[in-house]
Structures are given as C-alpha cells and as structure tokens.
Amino acid sequence: KSGAIGKPVAVDATCTSLTEIGSDPDYFRKNWNSSCAWGPTALLPVFQILGTDYKDMRIASVFADEKKTFDRFSKFDFTFDCAVATVKVGSGVKSEGELIVSGTNGYVYVPAPWWKTDYFEVRYENATENKRYFYQLNGEGIRYEIVAFVKAVENGKMTDCVSQGISREICKVVSKRERTEIKA
C-alpha cells in the first residue's frame, strides 16, 4: 500500500498441509476439502491487494475421491485488468507456503508459513536495497481475522477486519469450486 514495490502486478499465495485424508466416503462428507480449509486464507491477500474485480478465474483440481467431490489440491488463477494472481491450496499435499506480491519496482516476499509469520521482506533488483520488516501478529497470525469474524457472527456485530465485499467474493469463489465438484 505504501508503493514501495511500485504497482502490484501479481499475487501468489500458497497454503497446504499434510493432513491425513481418509478413504471412507463418510470422511469426504464430514471434512473440509482443501478449498474450504485453505481457500479463504489464501484468497484474502489477493482480494485485499488487487480487489475483487477480476475478469477471469480458472480452477484446476486434483481429487482424492472417485466421485470428484473432495479436492486434495486446487489451483485458482485470476486475471485482472492490470494484474494476475495464483492461489494454491492443498490438504494431504505439501508445498512451500509462501506469499509473493510482485510489483513494477520490486516485490514483497513473506516466507512460509506466511499466515503465521512475524516478518516479511521487500526485495529489489539491487539486493543492497532489500529490507526486512518485523511485526507481531495476534495468535495464529492471519487466522485471527477468521476468529474475529466468528465472534462478530456470534455477537451479531459486523467486524472491520475484512470488508463485506471481500468476504462475499471469497464465499463466491469457494462456492464455485463446490458447485464445480457437484457437476463433475
């Protein structure tokens, strides 16, 4: 937001965990797939940085079950007017859980696990200009925003942590993944 990296042109967010995935059909009905478990967390920085007015979205998934109702891994690709974004989520799959925001003058690198990290780096072509910033996140990092949302629902009060527009768009994207699974 400060403009330190110039204009953002790409956001890449990855969230995965080596969660044990069962093979019993009841498991798939009772547990969150990767899009439900990690989608909201991974989508949040995309929509906070680039907004929600994307022109195209494509989803590719690897499924854990024969009925293709439980995505083990999904990749979401977004095209905006002047930017792109990629979100990768996985359950029972491991990847480097980093966040990278590419800009016209440099980029922001947040190391794995970026949703819990206590620092990030602003990096440039000339490495001597790179800076590391430290900050303290509450509890489990970005997940405190989700906890704040749950408390807001319980108390019947809106929260300022995440805008309604971003919340709606996250729900829409995850729902689209779910509707796609039902059709498969």
In which residue ranges do the predicted regions lie?
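Predominantly a Rossmann-like dinucleotide-binding segment in NAD(P)-dependent oxidoreductases
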Residues: K1-R58
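Active-site rim elements
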Residues: W32-S34, Y133-Q136, G156-T159
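Contiguous beta-strand/loop segments that form the cofactor/metal-binding neighborhood of enzyme cores
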Residues: A37-K116, V147-K157
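A generic structural signal for residues located within well-ordered alpha-helices
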Residues: W38-T41, Y144, V162, I166
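Short polybasic amphipathic segments
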Residues: L99, T117-A127
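Surface-exposed loop/edge segments in extracytoplasmic proteins
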Residues: T128-R132
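Active-site loop of classical SDR/Rossmann-like NAD(P)-dependent oxidoreductases
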Residues: Y133-V147, V162
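C-terminal helix-rich "cap/oligomerization" subdomain common to oxidoreductases
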Residues: A148-A184
